[in-house]
Structure formats: structure tokens, C-alpha cells
Amino acid sequence: YQTSSPGSNITIGPL
């Protein structure tokens, strides 16, 4: 699961 935020990139969960 991948989420993108303004100014930051964060990856959550198994790839």
C-alpha cells in the first residue's frame, strides 16, 4: 500500500 502526501512520500505495508 502506497500513499503520497504533499511534500512527502511514504510507503506503508509490505512491498
Curated annotation (Swiss-Prot):
GO terms for cellular component: extracellular region. Signal peptide: none annotated. One of its GO terms (molecular function) is aspartic-type endopeptidase activity. Expressed in placenta, specifically the fetal cotyledonary tissue (FCT) (at protein level). Keywords: Aspartyl protease, Hydrolase, Protease, Secreted. It is found in: Secreted, Extracellular space. GO terms for biological process: proteolysis. It comes from the Eukaryota. Belongs to the peptidase A1 family. This is Pregnancy-associated glycoprotein 56B. The lineage of its organism: Eukaryota, Metazoa, Chordata, Craniata, Vertebrata.
